[in-house]
Amino acid sequence: MNPNQKIITIGSVSLGLVVLNILLHIVSITITVLVLPGNGNNGSCNETVIREYNETVRIEKITQWHNTNVIEYIERPESDHFMNNTEPLCDAKGFAPFSKDNGIRIGSRGHVFVIREPFVSCSPTECRTFFITQGSLLNDKHSNGTVKDRSPYRTLMSVEIGQSPNVYQARFEAVAWSATRCHDGKKWMTIGVTGPDAKAVAVVHYGGIPTDVIQSWAGDILRTQESSCTCIQGECYWVMTDGPANRQAQYRAFKAKQGKIIGQTEISFNGGHIEECSCYPNEGKVECVCRDNWTGTNRPVLVISPDLSYRVGYLCAGLPSDTPRGEDSQFTGSCTSPMGNQGYGVKGFGFRQGIDVWMGRTISRTSRSGFEILRVRNGWVQNSKEQIKRQVVVDNLNWSGYSGSFTLPVELTKRNCLVPCFWVEMIRGKPEEKTIWTSSSSIVMCGVDHEIADWSWHDGAILPFDIDKM
């Protein structure tokens, strides 16, 4: 075969293969378009399916066309009913770890906000960690001076529980240097306090939209809980303080529905001091354990009914739970009066368990270090010193800080009671450490039917950071 014949033969074979390939494609398209729709199985075309991922429902609209899936993520629909939250608290034998964000450790090399006052609150479908940023990042020059409580740069933001407060996953909630937030079953409600000390304003947000305001009525640093507010059958409750931190101030309880204030009441508490209440629902009422920043080392207790009537006093237990405080052996306790004669204080919490009480406190009597939770027999109603359970969460070699309460709703747990949970803030930096900044991370614990061993889930960041050495 001469060269020309070889070229013709190769060309003919190649042309034949091309024609065969085209014919196969035509047959494939014909079968796909004409034959497959006739088999009566159209279920996969333009189909909306619901899939579950880690307790979060994600709705996907899947459109199939020539073996190609086009997936469109659809916003989660709002619930059409309010949460009840009239169930009793579950009885807890111990508290198991729920989450830990490790924000400061991650922030040494990651884009993590400088924060304080973290807290947790839950909707029917998720729990989120909320925190008040300083408008700056860890290990950055703008973190200098963030020991200051109030500034125009502070904002309330949130992440899914367990995530660090990082810039990539955080969601803006409100401009605020004091805040509270809770979910009524349909939407989130937020109260964010901001502005000058003498004329601060609390802005109520519902579903992300400003819906109402509260003006400072005493002109002395209007402030709120720094933890979850409480919603019962669609009505949400929270407590605010206006006035001095070291003597008699003014206190009010508020009630809102779908972001509009529908009631408020002045809390008469002469000789007592209420700040930074940690509240939770229990048997149709709101129970709060607060901070006395004036004299008491026992904690104020406020129980609010749906009609805004209330009972106010002090945690009866014969053990103090504020910091600083004196020796347990020298403390007698009182259900009605401040005891201990120690100024200052720290945000804390307690849970009623029948007539017992779980009460959290720092291990140190003089500084915000270590953290333990004690169950005191009859401590809700009597000056009892009888500890029937004790659990260490942060050892006394490590810093702690604020602590507060929240509950897991029955929509999340499928139980017939509300699971009691708490968080512990672990403050790092100024004023205790040689840094230019102050920030915190947190550990979150929830009640379980088992005793849990003592351990220390402390912050663990190695300080100082690079910015502190410049």
Swiss-Prot record:
| Enzyme Commission identifier(s) | 3.2.1.18
Q: What's a Pfam family this protein contains?
A: Neur
Residue intervals on the Virion surface side: 36-470
Q: Name one GO cellular component term.
A: virion membrane
Sequence ranges on the Intravirion membrane side: 1-14
Q: Report the subcellular localization.
A: Virion membrane; Host apical cell membrane
Query: Could you tell me the keywords of this UniProt record?
Result: Calcium, Disulfide bond, Glycoprotein, Glycosidase, Host cell membrane, Host membrane, Hydrolase, Membrane, Metal-binding, Signal-anchor, Transmembrane, Transmembrane helix, Virion
What InterPro entries does the annotation carry?
Answer: Glyco_hydro_34, Sialidase_sf
Q: Which residues form the active site?
A: D149 (proton donor/acceptor), Y402 (nucleophile)
Q: How is its activity regulated?
A: Inhibited by the neuraminidase inhibitors zanamivir (Relenza) and oseltamivir (Tamiflu). These drugs interfere with the release of progeny virus from infected cells and are effective against all influenza strains. Resistance to neuraminidase inhibitors is quite rare.
Give the residue ranges for region: Involved in apical transport and lipid raft association: 11-32
Top-level lineage group? Viruses
For the protein in the UniProt heading, the enzyme class is hydrolase
Region Hypervariable stalk region, as annotated, extends over 32-86
Q: Which residues bind Ca(2+)?
A: D292, G296, D322
Q: Which residues are glycosylated?
A: N42, N46, N54, N84, N144, N293, N398
Please give the subunit comment from the record: Homotetramer.
Domain description from the entry?
A: Intact N-terminus is essential for virion morphogenesis. Possesses two apical sorting signals, one in the ectodomain, which is likely to be a glycan, and the other in the transmembrane domain. The transmembrane domain also plays a role in lipid raft association.
What remark does the entry add? The influenza A genome consist of 8 RNA segments. Genetic variation of hemagglutinin and/or neuraminidase genes results in the emergence of new influenza strains. The mechanism of variation can be the result of point mutations or the result of genetic reassortment between segments of two different strains.
This protein is called what?
Neuraminidase
- Natural source organism: Influenza A virus (strain A/Guinea fowl/New York/4-3587/1984 H3N8)
Designated gene of the protein:
NA
